[in-house]
Amino acid sequence: MKLIVLENEEQVANKAAQIISEQIKNKPNSVLGLATGSTPINTYKKLIQMYQEKQISFKDVISFNLDEYKDIDKNNKQSYYYFMKEQLFNYIDINKNNCYIPNASFYDNPIAYDELIKKANGIDLQLLGIGINGHIGFNEPDSSFDSLTQIVDLTNSTIKANSRFFDSIDQVPTQAISMGLQSIMNAKKILLLATGINKSEAIYHLIKGQITKKWPCTILQKHNDVTIIIDKNAASKLTNLKAN
């Protein structure tokens, strides 16, 4: 694991965008694994800026999103399909036919999503956030390390955390379709971002903890190419570290 500790959220986003842009420059037809939630938004803004300044092009990029709420209309403003359009896809030159999100067509056979990824020769760079309980994707505590794309039940803590995006907690879906932990581990490179004091415990377990299903993120310790970029608040439970 490579750990990069920076001063603030903006620096984290800039560094992440730099790594993603280098991946695309080195391999224009890169297969990217993309994430949603509040963490990657500033990274996507920076990538849009790079595209507008003609530093990079996404025209040959293929993307696979980690997850999507189950039984949510794709045009619902809280769907991850809508999120990706509004936060990235509408502002870059990516071919929308090359943008995949695990949707209703995969409910009956979720691992068909993994087969689609395999057909694209695998994910070159997987972008991840991390939940306060250590979930990655929607792989909650006690998820199998061998799991492929599947329909999952969301924990109360995740439903509560995601309720900030909805008018009420009752509107938050209780299930999602998510790439499994093995699906994520199959990526050639992984880039995980975290900011804020509320992510500090999960980051501590990710980096210092034992590999355990109680903290799904700890499986990443077994991957041979993981870069973790965090701000000093997310690093607050790690001792003897200084911001770069």
UniProtKB/Swiss-Prot annotation:
Domain of life: Bacteria
A GO molecular-function descriptor: glucosamine-6-phosphate deaminase activity
Swiss-Prot/TrEMBL catalytic activity: alpha-D-glucosamine 6-phosphate + H2O = beta-D-fructose 6-phosphate + NH4(+)
This protein's record includes keyword Hydrolase: yes
Enzyme nomenclature, EC number: 3.5.99.6
HAMAP family per the UniProt record, alphabetical: GlcN6P_deamin
Stated name of the protein: Glucosamine-6-phosphate deaminase
Organism expressing this protein natively: Mycoplasma mycoides subsp. mycoides SC (strain CCUG 32753 / NCTC 10114 / PG1)
GN (gene name): nagB
